């Protein structure tokens, strides 16, 4: 397994909405993550700094990267654009952390 860690941001006024939308995530998104080899995916909110710290274990970078091209991921990203900064393709602005 490959362990990944990354940070994202959440809008200061959107903490509760962000948490509501993730509790739970869409079942079809969860299924896509699992079918693409993602395990133990967890996201933690740092309210004081409006940061999200995420960890995930993946089976391969190729399968993990393929999640982004799925319809459900594209819809999820669009759904989240009003609560967190997004790139032009609606993916969340994120920075990968090095271990």
From Swiss-Prot:
InterPro entries per record: Dimeric_a/b-barrel, L-rhamnose_mutarotase, Rham/fucose_mutarotase
Keywords from the named record: Carbohydrate metabolism, Cytoplasm, Isomerase, Rhamnose metabolism
Pathway(s) served: Carbohydrate metabolism; L-rhamnose metabolism
One Gene Ontology term of the molecular function aspect: L-rhamnose mutarotase activity
GO BP, one annotated term: rhamnose catabolic process
List of residues binding substrate: 18, 41, 76-77
Catalytic function, reaction form: alpha-L-rhamnose = beta-L-rhamnose
A single GO cellular-component term on record: cytoplasm
EC number: 5.1.3.32
PANTHER family in alphabetical order: L-RHAMNOSE MUTAROTASE (PTHR34389:SF2)
Family as reported in the entry's similarity comment: Belongs to the rhamnose mutarotase family.
Annotated protein name in UniProt: L-rhamnose mutarotase
């Amino acid at each position: 397994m490959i362990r990944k860690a990354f940070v994202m941001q959440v809008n200061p006024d959107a903490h509760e909405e962000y948490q509501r939308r993730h509790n739970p995530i869409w079942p079809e998104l969860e299924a896509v993550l699992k079918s693409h080899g993602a395990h133990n995916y967890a996201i933690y909110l740092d309210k004081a700094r409006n940061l999200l710290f995420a960890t995930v274990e993946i089976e391969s970078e190729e399968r993990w990267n393929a999640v982004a091209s799925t319809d459900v991921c594209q819809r999820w990203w669009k759904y989240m654009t009003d609560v967190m900064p997004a790139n032009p393709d609606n993916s969340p602005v994120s920075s990968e952390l090095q271990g």
